[in-house]
A protein has these predicted regions:
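Active-site loop/helix belt of alpha/beta enzymes
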Residues: 1-77, 164
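Charged (often Lys/Glu-rich) extended helix/loop segments that serve as interaction or gating elements
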Residues: 42, 53-197
């Protein structure tokens, strides 16, 4: 973003009555390696040159690295390769996997082939493309195994869908001091129905 704002800017295309420029959705401005000093300098110079207020939309930056999505293996089968069907869905619960593409990290998993057992992880919907990706594990997956996807908070309430009536994931917090998990919201049929009306 800093590079974009420091280039010549075709502001003459904007309405003269506008005094606000909104930028940065999707920029990871909270990452430790993000050049915040440069961004501040560029925004300060931009404001002075164009006499515009600049609003930095934090987007997913406020939740970067936060939250997990805990899933269970529903079925394991083989069709040219080992497959594991999960009780989650790329299309319903993590659409950036299909749109970006975005590859979420799974605890104790690695890229395909890096560990002894590689699986293509699929979602639970009927969509042929509901595929999360290929991951490898130290041991074979079994029905009921839990897989924990990291950095998933930015999906929890914003981009999820109830495609084909798939239930949204429950929202819970974990207290590391006590190990207690508190469920704050469980979604059900009423939530699906109310999205349609």
């Amino acid at each position: 973003m800093a590079r974009a704002l420091s280039r010549p800017f075709p502001f003459h295309c904007a309405s003269a009555s506008k005094d606000l420029l909104r930028v940065a959705p999707g920029h990871h401005i909270t990452r430790p390696d993000y050049d915040v000093a440069r961004l501040i300098d560029v925004v300060t110079r931009f404001r002075a040159k164009w006499n515009k207020r600049v609003y930095l939309e934090p987007g997913e930056a406020i939740a970067l690295g936060a939250g997990v999505l805990v899933t269970s293996v529903l079925d394991v089968l083989h069709n040219d390769m080992d497959l594991a069907i999960l009780d989650t869905s790329a299309t319903a619960h993590m659409p950036d996997v299909l749109e970006m593409p975005y590859r979420p990290v799974i605890i104790d998993a690695a890229d395909a082939g890096a560990k002894p057992h590689t699986y293509r992880l699929g979602g639970m919907t009927c969509l042929a493309g509901d595929v999360i990706g290929d991951y490898s594990f130290e041991r074979p997956l079994a029905i009921g195994d839990k897989l924990v996807f990291l950095d998933m908070a930015h999906y929890t309430m914003v981009k999820t869908t109830t495609f084909n009536g798939v239930r949204l994931p429950s929202i819970a917090t974990h207290d590391p001091a006590t190990g207690k998990i508190t469920v704050h919201r469980r979604f059900g049929y009423r939530d699906y129905r109310d999205r349609l009306s």
